[in-house]
């Protein structure tokens, strides 16, 4: 769905909502116009002055050319030339007054219009803002309105005392709830009216859903449609996480008790052991359209064409036109009968990149359509990408950022901080995360709770929480090193999908959390480095979470800690 910011449209007077009287569009106003005072019809008057303007201009130019040839001063005028000058000035004044003022007004109004697609709306919705709306008549019985007339009924710009009228109009279906922002010009007020209308129509209370304290303008056309408030998720801090020689305080938005505390303990164990090291070894967002041919042979021919290195440069140029940050890396094809799936991989700078890669894919599809006119484009996404679902292609080939993070935990730290033994941790990891996950038929789930940490960091930093599915693909490895005294732990995460620009990253709270990590916005000196750093921080946080939870399980502390920190004593039914 294409959601864009639309212009604020004034509405017709609210008294017509109560009375049920149909209104004439503003452009059908029957008021007296200045042109009514002209002695001739308007089209004849315009024609007269047009003819006068061009005639006298031709006459004067002809006379001036003769004066120049004969050496006569131009300012010396005879009677006919004087009459021509007066006629020229009169015609210019008339034409400028008739056409020029309207042009200037339209130019100024366009310059002040904060919209992208004014032409999308009907001109019948516009009225003169200088007209003061009449007072709203209360307690007047509603008249039945024919269906054909309902579409023309809308109300004037509302003042604060008119909220009740608007709410009733929304409840009764005369004002679409989705149009409140564009009609009112106040996003917060639109959210309030929508929320109140929903409570009345559903009969359910939304008292606990807050409305104040949020910038609804910031989500218009970008993050959420038809808002009625916002939810509150506590944000905790784990750390410092010592990663690649730098310290990070990791924000985690969660409602699960123990999660932040456990991750914080893991960060402490890593810190006192000398820190963790992470490496990003792949960076490529993917999109895989599906196309169909009349035969499998033709599908195979396109596969050979796309995968031919001789054609890759041409396809790259076409693809990279979509953005100055998009750079096509490779195209991987798969055939199913006469259907072809093409998995495009590209770097996307500091953006997560789904929109960017989709635009590039569309460019290539348009190009291929000319080369293969019998190609039928079924969909720009054929699930071979694969987005927001567990898939072996992501686990094997990766999607987004692929990161490995490791640390060596000292023996005394394992005993004093984690309250367990190295050998116990290694055995538990093998039987739980490896063998147990294999028995369950897990796909990318060879870990204890990577999704817990990924979800919490994603919510705090404005990432797409639905991409937690593939981003949480992780295999946790543990091994005794240094003669069995110390613990080597690592997490390998092939598809961390993050960005530091776009989407929810521009919201105030999420932007503050990104700023805390030092990755807010785009990195102009090294495009893409902020998003890559965020991916390594996610992996480092997962490493800390895995280390602490596995230690709690091996020491038999899991149930005890959750009974202490993860139980609610509040009766939510009251």
UniProtKB/Swiss-Prot annotation:
Chain positions carrying an annotated carbohydrate: 78, 113, 320, 433, 566
InterPro entries: HMG_CoA_Rdtase (IPR002202), HMG_CoA_Rdtase_cat_sf (IPR023074), HMG_CoA_Rdtase_CS (IPR023076), HMG_CoA_Rdtase_eu_arc (IPR004554), HMG_CoA_Rdtase_N (IPR023282), HMG_CoA_Rdtase_NAD(P)-bd_sf (IPR009023), HMG_CoA_Rdtase_sub-bd_dom_sf (IPR009029)
Entry comment describing in which tissues the protein is expressed: Expressed in mature petals and anthers.
Biological process (GO), any one: coenzyme A metabolic process
Alphabetized UniProt keyword annotations: Endoplasmic reticulum, Glycoprotein, Isoprene biosynthesis, Membrane, NADP, Oxidoreductase, Transmembrane, Transmembrane helix
Gene3D superfamilies: 3-hydroxy-3-methylglutaryl-coenzyme A Reductase, Chain A, domain 2, HMGR, N-terminal domain, Hydroxymethylglutaryl-CoA reductase, class I/II, NAD/NADP-binding domain
Region (Disordered): 1-30
The keyword Glycoprotein appears for this protein: yes
Active-site residues per Swiss-Prot or TrEMBL entry: 256, 388, 464, 562
EC number(s) on file: 1.1.1.34
Claim: Glycoprotein is one of the keywords in the record: yes
Reactions it catalyzes: (R)-mevalonate + 2 NADP(+) + CoA = (3S)-3-hydroxy-3-methylglutaryl-CoA + 2 NADPH + 2 H(+)
Compartments (UniProt record): Endoplasmic reticulum membrane
Name of one Pfam family that matches: HMG-CoA_red
Similarity annotation: Belongs to the HMG-CoA reductase family.
Name under which the protein is recorded: 3-hydroxy-3-methylglutaryl-coenzyme A reductase 3
Organism the protein comes from: Solanum tuberosum
């Amino acid at each position: 769905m294409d959601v864009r910011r639309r212009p604020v449209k004034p509405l017709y007077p609210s008294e017509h909502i109560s009375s049920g009287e149909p209104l004439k569009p503003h452009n059908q106003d029957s008021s007296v116009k200045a042109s009514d005072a002209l002695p001739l019809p308007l089209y004849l008057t315009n024609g007269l002055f047009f003819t006068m303007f061009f005639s006298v201009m031709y006459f004067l130019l002809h006379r001036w050319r003769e004066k120049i040839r004969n050496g006569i001063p131009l300012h010396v005028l005879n009677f006919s030339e004087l009459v021509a000058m007066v006629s020229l000035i009169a015609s210019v004044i008339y034409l400028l007054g008739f056409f020029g003022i309207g042009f200037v007004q339209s130019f100024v109004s366009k310059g002040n219009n904060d919209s992208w697609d004014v032409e999308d709306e009907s001109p019948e919705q516009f009225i003169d803002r200088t007209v003061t709306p009449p007072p709203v008549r209360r307690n007047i019985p509603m008249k039945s309105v024919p269906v054909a007339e309902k579409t023309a009924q809308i109300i004037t710009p509302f003042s604060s005392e008119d909220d009740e009228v608007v709410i009733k109009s929304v409840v009764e279906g005369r004002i679409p709830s989705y149009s409140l922002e564009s009609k009112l010009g106040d996003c917060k007020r639109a959210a309030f009216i929508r929320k109140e209308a929903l409570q009345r129509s559903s009969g359910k209370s939304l008292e606990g859903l807050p409305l104040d304290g949020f910038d609804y303008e910031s989500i218009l056309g970008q993050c959420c449609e038809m808002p009625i408030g916002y939810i509150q998720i506590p944000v905790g801090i784990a750390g410092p996480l010592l990663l690649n020689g730098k310290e990070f305080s990791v924000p985690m938005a969660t409602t699960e008790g123990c999660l932040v505390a456990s991750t914080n303990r893991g960060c402490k164990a890593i810190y006192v052991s000398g820190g963790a090291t992470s490496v990003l070894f792949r960076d490529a967002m993917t999109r895989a359209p599906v196309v169909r041919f009349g035969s499998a042979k033709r599908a195979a021919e396109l596969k050979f064409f796309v995968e031919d290195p001789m054609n890759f440069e041409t396809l790259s140029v076409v693809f990279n036109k979509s953005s100055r940050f998009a750079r096509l890396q490779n195209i991987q094809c798969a055939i199913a009968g006469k259907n072809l799936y093409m998995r495009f991989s590209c770097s996307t700078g500091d953006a997560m990149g789904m929109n960017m890669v989709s635009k590039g894919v569309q460019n290539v599809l348009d190009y291929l359509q000319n080369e293969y006119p019998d190609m039928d484009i079924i969909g720009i996404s054929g699930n071979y990408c694969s987005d927001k679902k567990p898939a072996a292609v992501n686990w094997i080939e990766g999607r987004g950022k692929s990161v490995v993070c490791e640390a060596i935990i000292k023996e005394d730290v394992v005993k004093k901080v984690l309250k367990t033994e190295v050998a116990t941790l290694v055995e538990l990891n093998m039987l739980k995360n490896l063998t147990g996950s294999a028995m369950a038929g897990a796909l990318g789930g060879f870990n204890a709770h990577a999704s817990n940490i990924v979800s919490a960091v994603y919510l705090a930093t404005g990432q797409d929480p639905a991409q937690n599915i593939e981003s949480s693909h992780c295999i946790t490895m543990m091994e005794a090193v240094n003669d069995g005294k110390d613990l080597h732990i690592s997490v390998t995460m092939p598809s961390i999908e993050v960005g530091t620009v776009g989407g929810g990253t521009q919201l105030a709270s999420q932007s503050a959390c990104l700023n805390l990590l030092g990755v807010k916005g785009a990195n102009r000196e090294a495009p893409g480095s902020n998003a890559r750093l965020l991916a390594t921080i996610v992996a480092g946080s997962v490493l800390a979470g895995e280390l602490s939870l596995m230690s709690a399980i091996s020491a038999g502390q899991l149930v005890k800690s959750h009974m202490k920190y993860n139980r609610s004593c509040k009766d939510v039914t009251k």
